[in-house]
Regions:
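Vicinal oxygen chelate
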Residues: 3-12, 41-49, 63-154, 186-189, 198-200, 241-281, ...
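Short loop/beta submotifs within extracellular cysteine-rich repeat domains
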Residues: 28-29, 51-53, 60-62, 124, ...
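Acetyl-CoA-dependent GNAT
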Residues: 56-58, 127, 212-214, 280
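Short, flexible, glycine-rich and Lys/Arg-enriched loop motifs at helix boundaries
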Residues: 187-194, 214-218, 222-224
Length: 281
C-alpha cells in the first residue's frame, strides 16, 4: 500500500510504552513487517497503519515542543475513536496526562489531546470533519459514512499525522504532485496566527498540513540524536531507490550516512520532516 504506512515513536522504557500502546490504546503486535532488521523496533497494528516503537533508552525530545504548533515538523498523531469522552475517561483513569480536555472543535468534531509516556503528542477524535472547502466530495463522503458506522465503544485507530510547514504550495507540490496524495479539503481557523489546515489522503490515513501566516520556528529534528517521541513517518512507495530520486527532484534531501532500513531510505522534505521510504505492500 502506498501512502503513510507508519509513524515512528521513540521510547525510553520500551516495556512501559508497550503497556501504553498495547494494553491502554489496544494496538496489537504486527507480524511479518520486513522494514526493520533491528531488535530495538517493535511494530504494532493500529488500524490502517502501523506504530513503530523504537527503544531509544536515555534520550530527550530534541527541542521539540508539544505546545507550539508554530514549530515546523511533526506535530501530533491522531486516532479516530467512537466517543472521545468515553475514551478520555478511560485514559484519565489510567493516569494519562491531557494537554487539551475533550472539546468541540472547528469542523464539527470532538477531540482531546494527551501525551504518551515520553511526551509524544496524541489526539483522539470522533465524528467526521465538515470542511470549509471540499476538494474531493468522494473522500469527504467516505469519512462521513465511516463515522456513521463506527460504534460508540470503538477504540483508537490510526487516523492522521499532523505537520507544520512553511509554504503550502511547496508542500502540495511534494505530497500531492510527487507522492500522489489526494486533497480532501481545508479548514480555515483564521485568528491572529492565520491558521489553515489542509487535508490530504495518504493511503489509509490522512496527512494534516498546518500552515500559519504568523512566523514559524525551525524544525529541531536531526538524524544523529537519541530522540524520544515522534521520530518520523514511513511512506510506502513502489521502489524506494526510484522514489528518493524523484522526491529529491521535488525538494527532498536524502539523509547522509543512513544505513537503510531493510530496503527503506531516509530523507527529509523541505521542512525537515523525516520520511522513511519503504516498499509498498
Amino acid at each position: 500500500m502506498s501512502g503513510i504506512r507508519y509513524v515512528e515513536i521513540g521510547a525510553s522504557d520500551l516495556a512501559r510504552s508497550l503497556d501504553f500502546y498495547q494494553d491502554l490504546l489496544g494496538f496489537r503486535p504486527a507480524g511479518g513487517v520486513g522494514w526493520s532488521r533491528g531488535q530495538r523496533a517493535h511494530w504494532l497494528e493500529a488500524g490502517p497503519a502501523l506504530v513503530k516503537l523504537v527503544d531509544v533508552g536515555a534520550g530527550d525530545l530534541g527541542g521539540w515542543d508539544h505546545d507550539d504548533d508554530l514549530q515546523r515538523g511533526i506535530r501530533h498523531v491522531g486516532w479516530k475513536v467512537g466517543d472521545v469522552d468515553l475514551q478520555a475517561e478511560r485514559l484519565r483513569d489510567a493516569g494519562v496526562v491531557f494537554t487539551i480536555e475533550p472539546t468541540d472543535a472547528v469542523g464539527d468534531v470532538r477531540l482531546a489531546f494527551f501525551l504518551d509516556p515520553d511526551g509524544a503528542l496524541l489526539e483522539v477524535i470522533d465524528g467526521h470533519l465538515h470542511y470549509h472547502t471540499t476538494y474531493s466530495a468522494e473522500l469527504a463522503e467516505r469519512e462521513r459514512a465511516a463515522a456513521a458506522q463506527r460504534p460508540r465503544t470503538a477504540g483508537p485507530a490510526f487516523d492522521h499525522v499532523a505537520v507544520t510547514v512553511e509554504d503550502l504550495d511547496k508542500t502540495l507540490a511534494f505530497y500531492r504532485d510527487a507522492l500522489g496524495y489526494e486533497l480532501i479539503g481545508e479548514l480555515d481557523h483564521g485568528g491572529p496566527q492565520g491558521f489553515l489546515i489542509t487535508y490530504l489522503q495518504a493511503g489509509g490515513v490522512v496527512l494534516e498540513v498546518f500552515t500559519f501566516t504568523a512566523p514559524k520556528s525551525p524544525n529541531p529534528w536531526t538524524p544523529d540524536e537519541p530522540r524520544l517521541g515522534l521520530r518520523g513517518i514511513g511512506i510506502g512507495v513502489a521502489d524506494p531507490d526510484e522514489a528518493v530520486r524523484r522526491l529529491a527532484a521535488a525538494g527532498a534531501d536524502e539523509v547522509p550516512g543512513d544505513g537503510g532500513d531493510a530496503g527503506g531510505r531516509l530523507l527529509t522534505d523541505s521542512d525537515g520532516i523525516p520520511l522513511r521510504a519503504v516498499p509498498a505492500r
